[in-house]
């Protein structure tokens, strides 16, 4: 099926995928006066007395802004904010369909980090949460950090943390299959951009002890010249021994390969050099770092990709709707490390022991158990971490 042509037709016919629906029927003078003037003055005054009343008298508690500057749209590159609109509309559809969250696309005509931070800060009083989307690395790290520091609502860059959470969920179940402990395995993360960086830190937070990072120039090591600051930080944290080499060197004896890089980078010889029952998440799109059947023929036990036409799809829609659902319900001020880990464990837990096998380590996006499990886990973790307004 030609999804490109089908999608063009859909978008042309609908002229957009979202709309605003009124929750109030205004059919007479009384209902008009209640929903708008003069009645609306009463909740307005209550909010002016206490800003927290915005969660009582408005829809703010269920609203998320999906913000993008279009600098890293899917695998298409820097096409600008206007071109990002179909993607952001689609993201809003997923928020509603999979999480019951009302979301609005905010596509920006600037790629200046200071301007983006200021715009989002000034818009934030209208929303209960901010989802950053398709903002290029390493700018995305600074933008998210500054917004998290300066706002008291959740700020979540899905390209980073959504992917990291699903990878952790998949890895939890994959390690069960191969009967290995995350504290003991050697993990290679290839492609330390937005997703790869977040994956690495989350795996470390979950207990991983041995992580090697590599990019197109080879293994990251502290004394390497001309590295972006976030790569230097990763190298100094995870490669204190200053180990050097290429991807082939990195994967020798590894138990887990996580690719968020480019297609066809992982060869059969590399897979054969890994430990027995290797786990491979080859998430480059549209062409994975290695195709699942090729990886398995070379000895891999569990293989996941970013594609829906292969088993074990690493799909962010398993995470972000339920995460925001739980965070909004808890009136959380932040999305913490523990909330992310709780979400990953909840996603992994949807797959029962009876269902778990090498081709079924992650639930499907349409599994209704996912939203319930993730939102509850995130809600409970937010309360435990003390980041709620409740």
Predicted regions and their residues:
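Glycine-rich phosphate/diphosphate-binding loop of Rossmann-like nucleotide-binding domains
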Residues: 74, 79-99, 151, 157, ...
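Solvent-exposed alpha-helices and their adjacent loops that cap or buttress functional pockets
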Residues: 55-60, 96-97, 122-124, 148-149, ...
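Adenosine-phosphate binding glycine-rich loop
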Residues: 154, 158-159, 282-390
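Short, ordered loop/turn segments at secondary-structure junctions
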Residues: 69-71, 79, 108-109, 134-137, ...
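N-terminal ligand-binding/catalytic initiation module
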Residues: 1-155, 375, 381-389
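General beta-strand structural signal in soluble alpha/beta enzymes
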Residues: 105, 131-134, 155-158, 189, ...
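Rossmann-like adenosine-cofactor binding region
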Residues: 232-301, 308-309
């Amino acid at each position: 099926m030609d999804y490109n042509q089908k999608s063009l037709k859909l978008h042309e016919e609908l002229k957009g995928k979202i709309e605003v629906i009124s929750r109030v029927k205004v059919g007479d003078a009384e209902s008009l006066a209640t929903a708008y003037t003069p009645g609306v003055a009463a909740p307005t005054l209550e909010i002016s007395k206490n800003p927290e009343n915005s969660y009582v008298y408005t829809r703010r508690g269920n609203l998320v802004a999906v913000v993008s500057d279009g600098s890293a749209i899917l695998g298409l590159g820097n096409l600008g904010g206007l071109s990002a609109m179909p993607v952001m509309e689609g993201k809003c559809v997923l928020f509603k369909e999979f999480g019951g969250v009302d979301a609005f696309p905010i596509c920006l005509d600037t790629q200046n980090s200071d301007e983006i931070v200021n715009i989002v800060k000034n818009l934030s009083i209208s929303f209960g949460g901010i989802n950053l989307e398709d903002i290029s690395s390493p700018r995305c790290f600074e933008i998210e950090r500054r917004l998290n520091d300066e706002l008291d609502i959740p700020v979540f860059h899905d390209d980073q943390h959504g992917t990291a959470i699903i990878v952790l969920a998949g890895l939890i179940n994959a390690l069960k299959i191969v009967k290995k402990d995350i504290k003991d395995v050697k993990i290679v993360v290839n492609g330390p951009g937005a997703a790869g960086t977040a994956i690495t830190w989350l795996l470390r937070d979950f207990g991983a002890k041995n992580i090697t990072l590599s990019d197109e120039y080879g293994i990251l090591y502290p004394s390497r010249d001309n590295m972006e600051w976030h790569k230097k930080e990763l190298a100094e944290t995870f490669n204190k021994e200053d180990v050097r080499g290429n991807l082939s060197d990195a994967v020798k004896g590894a138990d887990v390969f996580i690719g968020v890089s480019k297609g066809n980078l992982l060869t059969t010889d590399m897979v054969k050099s890994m430990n027995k029952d290797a786990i491979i998440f080859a998430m480059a799109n549209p062409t994975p770092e290695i195709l699942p059947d090729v990886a398995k023929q070379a000895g891999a036990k569990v293989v996941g990709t970013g594609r829906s036409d292969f088993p074990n799809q690493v799909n962010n829609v398993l995470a972000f709707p339920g995460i925001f659902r739980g965070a909004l319900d808890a009136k959380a001020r932040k999305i913490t490390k523990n909330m992310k880990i709780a979400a990953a464990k909840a996603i992994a837990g949807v797959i029962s022991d009876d269902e778990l096998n090498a081709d079924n380590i992650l639930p499907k996006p349409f599994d209704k158990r996912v939203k319930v499990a993730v939102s509850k886990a995130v809600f409970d973790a937010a309360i435990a971490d003390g980041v709620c307004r409740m």
